[in-house]
UniProtKB/Swiss-Prot annotation:
<keyword id="KW-0831">Ubiquinone biosynthesis</keyword>
<keyword id="KW-1003">Cell membrane</keyword>
<keyword id="KW-0472">Membrane</keyword>
<feature type="binding site">
    <location>
        <position position="171"/>
    </location>
    <ligand>
        <name>Fe cation 1</name>
    </ligand>
</feature>
<dbReference type="Pfam" id="PF03232">
    <property type="entry name" value="COQ7"/>
</dbReference>
<dbReference type="InterPro" id="IPR012347">
    <property type="entry name" value="Ferritin-like"/>
</dbReference>
<feature type="binding site">
    <location>
        <position position="57"/>
    </location>
    <ligand>
        <name>Fe cation 1</name>
    </ligand>
</feature>
<feature type="binding site">
    <location>
        <position position="171"/>
    </location>
    <ligand>
        <name>Fe cation 2</name>
    </ligand>
</feature>
<dbReference type="GO" id="GO:0008682">
    <property type="term" value="F:3-demethoxyubiquinol 3-hydroxylase activity"/>
</dbReference>
<feature type="binding site">
    <location>
        <position position="87"/>
    </location>
    <ligand>
        <name>Fe cation 1</name>
    </ligand>
</feature>
<keyword id="KW-0503">Monooxygenase</keyword>
<feature type="binding site">
    <location>
        <position position="87"/>
    </location>
    <ligand>
        <name>Fe cation 2</name>
    </ligand>
</feature>
<feature type="binding site">
    <location>
        <position position="174"/>
    </location>
    <ligand>
        <name>Fe cation 2</name>
    </ligand>
</feature>
<comment type="function">
    <text>Catalyzes the hydroxylation of 2-nonaprenyl-3-methyl-6-methoxy-1,4-benzoquinol during ubiquinone biosynthesis.</text>
</comment>
<keyword id="KW-0560">Oxidoreductase</keyword>
<dbReference type="InterPro" id="IPR011566">
    <property type="entry name" value="Ubq_synth_Coq7"/>
</dbReference>
<keyword id="KW-0408">Iron</keyword>
Length: 208
């Protein structure tokens, strides 16, 4: 681990928490040319869902940073970096959509980031196969979570839907990459604990 790498990851972490992440791909757009009008209630609900998604991407940045820093494999470092760059797009897209909805990111982003970073370090210290298994299980749970949001988003909110659909496609790809790279299936207690932690995060971030 070199000093330059630590500085780079520290900068990425600050940008993730502050909501000023860079995007390498443009914000996904729906096929319809003109956005539909949302009621006040629909905007509030869509904003809550997109705030949850934004928090998920803050956590993803922390997890991948920790896993990248704790592996000694150059190939896995590159895989985690590639996934982190795509997740950084998600972070920027959801922040952009929150602004469009006249809303804001979670006030607890520093807490979410710190917790995810600690979990990522623990997963990384348990070895590459466990770390990759953790990545695969995380992506499976995120995929399920995004499926739920696609059914919950207001029918008229095509802009948020386009973003979530592309995020879902990327998460599926990341999960498959982790499994193909040798990730093991985590034991049921670990998967249940991850779901419980995710439920606390999503139910809180919707409002805060």
């Amino acid at each position: 681990m070199v000093f330059d790498e630590l500085i780079t990851e520290f900068d990425r972490g600050l940008r993730s928490i502050a909501g000023v992440s860079r995007m390498s791909r443009p914000v996904p757009k729906p096929a319809a040319a003109a956005p539909a009008e949302l009621s006040a209630a629909e905007r509030k609900h869509a904003a809550g869902l997109m705030r949850v998604n934004h928090v998920g991407e803050v956590c993803a940045q922390a997890l991948y940073q920790a896993q990248k820093l704790t592996t000694s494999s150059a190939g896995l470092k590159e895989m985690f970096e590639h996934a982190a760059r795509e997740e950084e797009d998600h972070l920027a897209w959801t922040a952009h959509r929150l602004k469009d909805l006249d809303s804001r990111p979670s006030l607890l982003n520093p807490l979410w980031y710190a917790g995810a970073l600690a979990i990522g370090v623990v997963a990384g210290r348990l070895g590459d196969k466990v770390s990759l298994g953790f990545m695969a299980e995380t992506e499976r749970q995120v995929e399920s979570h995004l499926d739920g949001h696609l059914s919950e988003l207001p029918a008229a909110d095509a802009e948020s839907r386009a973003i979530v659909e592309q995020m879902r496609a990327d998460e599926v790809k990341h999960g498959k990459s982790a499994t193909d790279a040798g990730g093991i299936e985590l034991p049921m207690p670990a998967r249940m604990l991850m779901r419980a932690a995710s439920k606390v995060m999503t139910s809180t971030a919707y409002y805060l």
